[in-house]
Every structure is written in C-alpha cells, then in structure tokens.
C-alpha cells in the first residue's frame, strides 16, 4: 500500500495554468464582445466586473473560454452551475502530472488518452480544458438530460473541440456502470461531487456565499485570487450539481466501492473533496476494498486550498 500526500508550498495556481495574475479585460473583450457592458472601473482604478451578477460572471466565462481555449461558443441554461474556469483548469493540469507518473515522467497527450468526467454538467468545462490543453478525448456523464443536451451541443458546435462524447447516466445509483462500456479503457476519471446533503442545505450555502460576496465588495475583485476569496462563481446549480442524499461523503464512498468493478478499465480514479475531514474516510474505504495506491493532491488558489484524491488498483506504481 502506497499513500502519498502532496504539500502546498505556495498559494498560487498550477505553473501551466493560463489564468495566473489579473484579468486582461481588453483582450477578453476582444475575444467576446458580450463581456464589455459588464466591465467597470472599481474604486482602485482597476477594471473588474460585478461578481454578484450571474450574467456578468457568465460573460466572463465565455470570454475566458474564447480567448484561452479557442471555444467561441459556450452557454449554459438559466439556473445551471457557472464554474470558475481557473480552478477547473488546475484540476486538469494536476491530473496531467498524475498521468506522467505512470508514463515515465512524461505527460501523455493526444486523443488516445481518455478521461471520464463524472457529472459533466451543462457547462462541459473539464472536457473543454483537457481537450484543448492536452488533446485528450473525453466522455462526460450526467444524470440530468438537460445537462447532457447542452454539453453535447457545446462539444459539437466548436470546431476546435475533438473527441468529446456526453452520455446520460440513466440509473442514479450508478456512477460508472452504464457509462463505461465493456471494452473501454480510461486513463483517468474525474469528478466534482455534490457537496450538500439536501436542498435546504444547498440553499443555505448559496446564501452564505452571497453574504461573503457582499462583505468582500470593497476589495479590488479583478484577479482570480480575489475572485476565489469571494466565492463568486458558483451561482445557480441544479439538484445533481449541488446535493445528493448523504452529501459529499456518501457520494465519494459509493464511488470508491463502485470503482472496484472497473479496476481493470481505469488507470486512475480521482475525485475532488471539499471537506477535508472526508479525505480520511475515503482512505479507509479504499484500503478496505484493496486499492494498491492512494494519493492526495492539494491545490492552492489565493487563500483557498482544495484537493483531490487519486487511486489506482495497479501494483508497483512508483510515486
């Protein structure tokens, strides 16, 4: 059994992340004119947007995807999760480093590398970034038909995106079964699991974010680090995106249990974990079912620390 925990020594994004520093609003507006009406000069004389305005946040996301990833068409239905692009990119880049461990230290690129995004959502952001940065192929799964419809529309209507397929999970109790085909192999899976245990808990969480945002309103607000501190980009979200019975812990334990059936079809299973105390519980479950190697990778964005746990059933993985 090999257990490794990474150490965060600096409060910054991954070195390959394109979103370090402040936003270049003139360049973003050039890529997406829809952003222009939302850009304003704050009290410090810096260009910014009102991060409490969901339409402004969506326009910023559209501009970031158009400018950095050559994805000119992107949209989400009203009420669906609008994720922070820089943080999503960090997960992808750290997975690339993880894949290098089992590829003689070299990050594998190209369409033969295949990832599964569990809970792709309507936004399709993880497949977009992974496809454009490393040319990986993706399957995105979701239990929500509208999410699959929109994510597929995004993937099929941007010429720069190649090899992204979205599949509907018809059984809410299954995570991998019904999605991974019998002869399919994935280099990795990834997931941003539902955080809350009920709709009421999710609503209360949204209200807390709004209060935090109001408290931070006097800050500059134009850099990614400041944006993360304000927790401004998780507006909206459908049931499947925000909560499930038992919350995050129940979901990731189910994922661990169900991963065993696909131990020969997936090289690395990974999942984000928001609640630090849930990491130890996941480790216990993985050790109980015979996982050979477990690794925790921490990521830092400003004052915010996030993490994902990766595991593989392969023996003799040299971490």
UniProtKB/Swiss-Prot annotation:
It is an enzyme of class 2 (transferase). One of its GO terms (cellular component) is cytoplasm. The keyword Signal does not apply. One of its GO terms (biological process) is rRNA base methylation. It catalyses: adenosine(1618) in 23S rRNA + S-adenosyl-L-methionine = N(6)-methyladenosine(1618) in 23S rRNA + S-adenosyl-L-homocysteine + H(+). Keywords: Cytoplasm, Methyltransferase, rRNA processing, S-adenosyl-L-methionine, Transferase. Pfam families: Methyltransf_10. It is found in: Cytoplasm. Its EC number is 2.1.1.181. GO terms for molecular function: 23S rRNA (adenine(1618)-N(6))-methyltransferase activity. Coiled coil: none annotated. Specifically methylates the adenine in position 1618 of 23S rRNA. Belongs to the methyltransferase superfamily. METTL16/RlmF family. This is Ribosomal RNA large subunit methyltransferase F. The lineage of its organism: Bacteria, Pseudomonadati, Pseudomonadota, Gammaproteobacteria, Vibrionales.
């Amino acid at each position: 059994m090999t257990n490794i925990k990474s150490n965060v020594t600096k409060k910054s994004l991954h070195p390959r992340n394109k979103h370090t520093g402040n936003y270049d609003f003139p360049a973003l507006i050039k890529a997406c004119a829809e952003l222009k009406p939302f850009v304003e000069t704050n009290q410090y004389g810096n260009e910014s947007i009102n991060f409490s305005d969901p339409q402004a946040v969506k326009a910023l996301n559209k501009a970031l995807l158009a400018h950095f990833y050559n994805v000119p068409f992107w949209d989400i239905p009203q009420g669906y999760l609008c994720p922070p692009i820089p943080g999503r990119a960090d997960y992808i880049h750290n997975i690339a480093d993880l894949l290098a461990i089992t590829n003689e230290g070299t990050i594998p690129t190209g369409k033969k590398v295949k990832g599964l995004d569990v809970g792709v959502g309507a936004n399709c952001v993880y497949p977009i970034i992974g496809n454009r940065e490393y040319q990986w192929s993706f399957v995105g799964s979701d239990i929500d038909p509208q999410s699959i419809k929109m994510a597929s529309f995004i993937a099929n209507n941007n010429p720069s995106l190649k090899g992204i397929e979205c599949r509907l999970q018809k059984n809410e109790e299954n995570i991998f079964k019904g999605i991974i085909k019998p002869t399919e192999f994935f280099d990795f899976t990834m997931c941003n699991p539902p955080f809350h245990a009920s709709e009421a808990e999710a609503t209360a969480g949204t209200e807390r974010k709004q209060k935090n945002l109001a408290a931070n309103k006097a800050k500059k607000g134009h850099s990614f680090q400041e944006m993360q501190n304000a927790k401004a980009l998780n507006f909206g979200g459908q049931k499947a995106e925000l909560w499930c019975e038992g919350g995050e812990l129940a979901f990731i334990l189910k994922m661990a249990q169900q991963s065993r059936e696909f131990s020969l079809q997936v090289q690395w299973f990974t999942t984000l974990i928001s609640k630090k105390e849930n990491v130890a519980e996941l480790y216990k479950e993985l050790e109980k079912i015979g996982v050979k190697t477990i690794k925790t990778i921490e990521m830092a964005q400003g004052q915010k620390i996030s993490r994902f746990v990766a595991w593989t059933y392969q023996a003799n993985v040299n971490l």
